[in-house]
Amino acid sequence: MAQSPLMIRAEGLVKHFGAVTALAGVDFSAASGTVLGLLGPNGAGKTTAVRILTTLLVPDAGHAEVAGFDVVRHPQEVRERIGLAGQQASVDEYLTGRDNLVMVGRLYHLSTRQARQRADELLERFELADAATRIVKNYSGGMRRRLDLAASLVVAPPVLLLDEPTTGLDPRSRMGMWSVIQDLVKDGTTLLLTTQYLEEADRLAGHIAVIDHGRVVAAGSPDELKRSLGGERIDVQIRDAAQLRLAEAAVARAVGRAPELDAELRRLTVSVSTGAQALTAVVRALDVEGITVEDIGLRRPTLDEVFLKLTGHEAELVGDPSEVREGA
């Protein structure tokens, strides 16, 4: 079976802002009709990469292509084939929702009739039809984000770049946005999604590139990244701290390796390769020793753990160098 053509490709991207290196040789790609997740804290270089792909920044080294066009040599062709929704909604808050979409359509040279028709289609699709005639200033944050995403789809671009589209949304609005994104992919759109929400990347992206300090520190599918931590593990929390050493010995006998201990939480953790079979053996061993268990379970590594292992820190909020430069 032939592979889908690459709709996004970046090779060796480098970008400096004064003494700050925002990108230090970044590579990634996305095939047609797939979702590529760029995962990392703000300041890692995600937004800088997006700004290069959308022709808003020129790389200092390396090159990138979108829909087969070089972003430096053919910027107009790239712009005609992309949609962009950034971290902040870019709609006009003093226009109605419908007027915002019609305006975007007219800027893309649609006729007034075509622009109105497309606006109504998108308002319906994004569940904004009832608010079509309301001033956007009175929209909720989730509604503004949906309208902003709708505006990026007025001309149905084959490539859509979403820069942290759900940051600041409540859980219900975030899940609604996820549903919209999944529908777009089903329709054949290629998406590049930057996010600091690990659950979001796990849910939406078929391939993830983890960026930290301007470098890709790992890449693969969510499952591949999780497996890189060593497969499944058994977590045990016992009731009586005095039994911790006894529990340690019992678990070690059951699975053939010593577990890691957290005395403060009265917890033992051990990696296993036989899954449910190992869990059954641990339960029996603890029962034989008369150890009271508060919680026990077989768990897979999470993207949170992958990210922490790769970067040494969690996804804290710091400024992106490209944004600092632009705002100076």
Where are the predicted features?
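Preference for bulky hydrophobic residues occupying beta-strand positions
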Residues: 15, 28, 236-238, 270, ...
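ABC transporter nucleotide-binding domains
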Residues: 5-10, 15-212, 217-218
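Hydrophobic/basic alpha-helical segments enriched in Actinobacteria
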Residues: 14, 20, 33, 44, ...
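Conserved short beta-strand edge segments in small beta-sheet-based binding/regulatory domains
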Residues: 260-261, 292-299
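Short proline/glycine- and acidic-rich turn/helix-capping motifs at secondary-structure junctions
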Residues: 264-273, 299-309
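ABC transporter nucleotide-binding domain
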Residues: 179-273
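Topological signature of polytopic alpha-helical transporters
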Residues: 254, 267-269, 284-294, 315-328
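ABC-family P-loop ATPase nucleotide-binding domain
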Residues: 1-14, 313-328
